[in-house]
Amino acid sequence: METSNILDFETRTFYKTITIGRGRRQQLVNSSGRFCVAFRMEGTRSQLCYRIWKELIPDAVQRYKMIGERISRTQLEYFSGFRYVPSALRMKCDGSILPGIVMEWIEGKKLDAFMTEEWATLSDVQRLTFIRDFYYMCHLLRKNGIAHGDLSCMNILVTPERDIRLVDYDSLFVSEMGRNFYQTTGGAPAFQHPDRTNASYPMLTSLEDDNFSQLVIALSLWVAYFDPSVTQNYDDSNLLFLPGDISGETGSERLRNLKDSDGWKRAEKVATKFGHIPILMKGLESIQYSVNQVPSLLKFVNEEVIISADFYRLLDSADRNVSSMQPVPYCTACGQKFENDEFKFCTACGTKRHTYTVSSSFIPYRHEQSM
């Protein structure tokens, strides 16, 4: 991509493409998906992602207008701000003009790379914090009427600070869409119900699009929490399961493939250690039914549990109740994460930090002192 072919004035004027290699081996830093090619560009103070549509998404302008307004209004930290560019690039070969979007470049590792390269180096508390952050993201997306539509290792980045960021918004659902738009993709095969990946007819997009992928990722994280060695099998943009593990022509075949998989067997080995794991596995057994019957992760956990300092114990569930007053780890107004228990006001919006009473199931466990 030559800079002279970039039609967006601001990008062409203040940014340049980033290349790797030398001479004839020199090439642009880019990544490619089904619909877009994304180029990394560098300015004096920032970097951006210049995404060019190689295949136009149906109703792209309407979709991105709704998506942009929703992201701007909610200000969720998981998304990058962007703007739609109807005339983004002139093709050198034939002069045709392609649309695209300009967005902030997010620095981070894909989820599978983070798991294989860093997970084993984290403490138990750091792993638990990351899992809770994933659950909180799922909660906030649903609370704000958003489904990503293609949650997978390719589209979940982990920053150097271990914050979660989402990329590739072509498949996003926002509540303004209602039941008027079709899904743009079936998603990554190792994360999606077969009804989506093998759909023989267009499926309407909805708030439920992330249900199956959230269960897959949640189970993968918990299995890795108890058995960090499993992350060495998380490669090629897959986690606990491979595409063949989540496939089949009939419900019974799908369930059999899932339960015969190495990932399922790894989950069974640690299932007795934590009461939430069998619940997630039961949720994934919905693979034998239609995609409309897949439960949301949020059916099994609510906001009070996620923000609780007793997150682990509440999910593990036991018989004896213990009540305690706890400060919330996230601002209830804007969602900003408090760095430690000393902060009494949100540093982002100034809202006073709330506390709440937890009546939880108490089981002594290895994080009791460090949490």
Label each residue range with its predicted role:
Residues R24-L28, R34-G81:
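ATP-binding glycine-rich loop module of kinase domains
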Residues V223-M325:
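Helical subdomain adjoining the active site within ATP-dependent kinase catalytic cores
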Residues C138-T159:
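Catalytic-loop of the protein kinase fold
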Residues P329, A348-S360:
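Short Cys/His-rich micro-motifs in 6-15 aa windows
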Residues Y78-D124:
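Conserved structural core of kinase catalytic domains
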Residues M1-V29, Q62-R63:
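Juxta-kinase regulatory segment immediately upstream of eukaryotic protein kinase catalytic domains
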Residues N180-R196:
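Conserved activation segment of eukaryotic-like protein kinases, specifically the C-terminal portion
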Residues N155-Y169:
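Conserved protein kinase catalytic/activation segment
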